[in-house]
Design a protein with these regions (language model features):
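N-terminal amphipathic alpha-helix/helix-capping segment at the start of soluble metabolic enzymes
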Residues: 1-33
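Short, well-ordered coil/turn segments that N-cap beta-strands
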Residues: 24-28, 63-64, 101-103, 123-125
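Conserved, mostly hydrophobic/aromatic
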Residues: 32, 58, 62, 108, ...
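Active-site mouth loops of central-metabolism enzymes
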Residues: 34-53, 78-79, 105-106
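Glycine-rich, proline-tolerant flexible connector loops at the mouths of alpha/beta enzymes
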Residues: 38-40, 65-91
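Alpha-helix-loop-beta-strand connector modules within alpha/beta enzyme cores
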Residues: 78-107, 112-117
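Catalytic beta/alpha-barrel core
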Residues: 102-110, 125-136
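Glycine-enriched alpha-helix->loop->beta-strand junction motifs that scaffold or abut catalytic
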Residues: 116-126
Length: 136
Protein backbone atom coordinates (compact mmCIF):
# COMPACT_ATOMS: atom_id res chain seq x y z
CA UNK A 1 0.00 0.00 0.00
CA UNK A 2 1.34 3.43 -0.98
CA UNK A 3 1.34 6.33 1.48
CA UNK A 4 -1.36 8.94 0.88
CA UNK A 5 1.15 11.75 1.47
CA UNK A 6 3.54 11.36 -1.44
CA UNK A 7 4.49 15.00 -2.02
CA UNK A 8 6.78 15.12 1.03
CA UNK A 9 7.35 11.37 1.19
CA UNK A 10 11.16 11.53 1.15
CA UNK A 11 12.98 12.77 4.21
CA UNK A 12 15.16 15.78 3.45
CA UNK A 13 17.11 17.99 5.81
CA UNK A 14 19.71 20.75 5.82
CA UNK A 15 22.60 21.04 8.25
CA UNK A 16 22.93 24.74 9.08
CA UNK A 17 25.81 25.47 11.46
CA UNK A 18 25.26 22.13 13.18
CA UNK A 19 21.49 22.58 13.45
CA UNK A 20 19.53 19.97 11.51
CA UNK A 21 16.59 21.56 9.67
CA UNK A 22 13.89 19.01 8.89
CA UNK A 23 12.40 19.70 5.46
CA UNK A 24 9.65 17.09 5.64
CA UNK A 25 7.28 20.03 6.08
CA UNK A 26 7.43 23.38 4.27
CA UNK A 27 9.52 26.19 5.76
CA UNK A 28 8.81 29.91 5.42
CA UNK A 29 11.55 32.15 4.04
CA UNK A 30 11.15 35.84 4.80
CA UNK A 31 12.59 38.18 2.16
CA UNK A 32 14.55 41.25 3.24
CA UNK A 33 15.54 43.53 0.37
CA UNK A 34 18.16 46.06 1.43
CA UNK A 35 18.25 47.72 -1.98
CA UNK A 36 17.02 51.24 -2.70
CA UNK A 37 15.42 50.11 -5.98
CA UNK A 38 13.67 46.80 -5.30
CA UNK A 39 10.44 46.52 -7.29
CA UNK A 40 8.65 45.21 -4.20
CA UNK A 41 9.83 47.27 -1.24
CA UNK A 42 12.79 49.33 -2.40
CA UNK A 43 14.38 51.59 0.16
CA UNK A 44 12.29 50.53 3.16
CA UNK A 45 14.93 48.50 5.00
CA UNK A 46 18.26 50.28 4.91
CA UNK A 47 18.95 51.24 8.52
CA UNK A 48 19.75 48.87 11.37
CA UNK A 49 16.49 49.81 13.12
CA UNK A 50 14.37 49.14 9.99
CA UNK A 51 16.20 45.87 9.31
CA UNK A 52 15.73 44.56 12.84
CA UNK A 53 12.06 45.57 12.98
CA UNK A 54 11.27 43.80 9.69
CA UNK A 55 13.33 40.72 10.60
CA UNK A 56 11.60 40.42 13.98
CA UNK A 57 8.20 40.79 12.31
CA UNK A 58 8.96 38.05 9.77
CA UNK A 59 10.19 35.66 12.48
CA UNK A 60 7.10 36.40 14.60
CA UNK A 61 4.92 35.64 11.56
CA UNK A 62 6.55 32.23 11.11
CA UNK A 63 9.67 32.70 9.00
CA UNK A 64 12.41 30.25 9.90
CA UNK A 65 14.79 31.53 7.21
CA UNK A 66 15.63 35.17 6.43
CA UNK A 67 16.82 35.78 2.85
CA UNK A 68 18.78 39.03 2.51
CA UNK A 69 19.26 40.59 -0.92
CA UNK A 70 21.35 43.66 -1.71
CA UNK A 71 21.27 43.64 -5.51
CA UNK A 72 17.99 44.35 -7.27
CA UNK A 73 17.12 41.87 -10.01
CA UNK A 74 14.23 43.89 -11.37
CA UNK A 75 14.42 44.78 -15.07
CA UNK A 76 16.33 48.02 -15.59
CA UNK A 77 17.84 48.03 -12.09
CA UNK A 78 21.14 49.81 -11.54
CA UNK A 79 24.22 47.60 -11.94
CA UNK A 80 26.16 48.00 -8.70
CA UNK A 81 29.69 46.87 -7.87
CA UNK A 82 30.38 43.85 -5.67
CA UNK A 83 31.82 46.28 -3.11
CA UNK A 84 28.52 48.20 -2.93
CA UNK A 85 26.57 44.95 -2.61
CA UNK A 86 28.87 43.86 0.23
CA UNK A 87 28.48 47.23 1.97
CA UNK A 88 24.68 46.95 1.86
CA UNK A 89 24.78 43.35 3.11
CA UNK A 90 27.16 44.04 6.00
CA UNK A 91 24.70 46.45 7.62
CA UNK A 92 21.94 43.84 7.53
CA UNK A 93 24.08 40.82 8.42
CA UNK A 94 25.74 42.59 11.36
CA UNK A 95 22.34 43.51 12.78
CA UNK A 96 20.64 40.16 12.18
CA UNK A 97 23.51 38.01 13.47
CA UNK A 98 23.75 40.14 16.63
CA UNK A 99 20.04 40.34 17.49
CA UNK A 100 18.85 37.01 16.04
CA UNK A 101 21.92 34.73 16.33
CA UNK A 102 19.99 31.49 15.83
CA UNK A 103 17.99 32.44 12.75
CA UNK A 104 18.90 30.74 9.48
CA UNK A 105 20.26 33.36 7.09
CA UNK A 106 20.23 33.11 3.32
CA UNK A 107 22.05 35.63 1.13
CA UNK A 108 20.64 36.32 -2.32
CA UNK A 109 23.62 36.96 -4.63
CA UNK A 110 25.01 35.70 -7.92
CA UNK A 111 28.54 36.91 -7.18
CA UNK A 112 31.11 34.52 -5.73
CA UNK A 113 33.01 37.37 -4.03
CA UNK A 114 29.88 38.43 -2.17
CA UNK A 115 28.96 34.84 -1.27
CA UNK A 116 32.46 34.18 0.07
CA UNK A 117 32.31 37.27 2.30
CA UNK A 118 28.89 36.27 3.64
CA UNK A 119 30.00 32.73 4.47
CA UNK A 120 33.41 33.64 5.91
CA UNK A 121 32.44 36.75 7.87
CA UNK A 122 28.88 35.93 8.95
CA UNK A 123 28.59 32.14 8.62
CA UNK A 124 25.43 32.49 6.54
CA UNK A 125 23.64 29.21 6.09
CA UNK A 126 22.40 29.40 2.50
CA UNK A 127 23.50 31.14 -0.69
CA UNK A 128 20.46 31.85 -2.88
CA UNK A 129 22.00 32.26 -6.35
CA UNK A 130 19.67 32.80 -9.32
CA UNK A 131 22.51 31.76 -11.64
CA UNK A 132 23.21 28.48 -9.80
CA UNK A 133 26.86 29.50 -9.56
CA UNK A 134 27.28 30.13 -13.28
CA UNK A 135 27.45 33.96 -13.28
CA UNK A 136 31.08 34.19 -12.25
Amino acid sequence: MKSKDTFFSKKYSLNCRGKLINLSTPKIMGILNVTPDSFYDGGKFRTKKEILKKTGQMIKEGASIIDVGAYSSRPGAENITPEEEIKRLRTALDAIRTDFPDVIISVDTFRSQVALMAVKDYEVDIINDISAGAAD
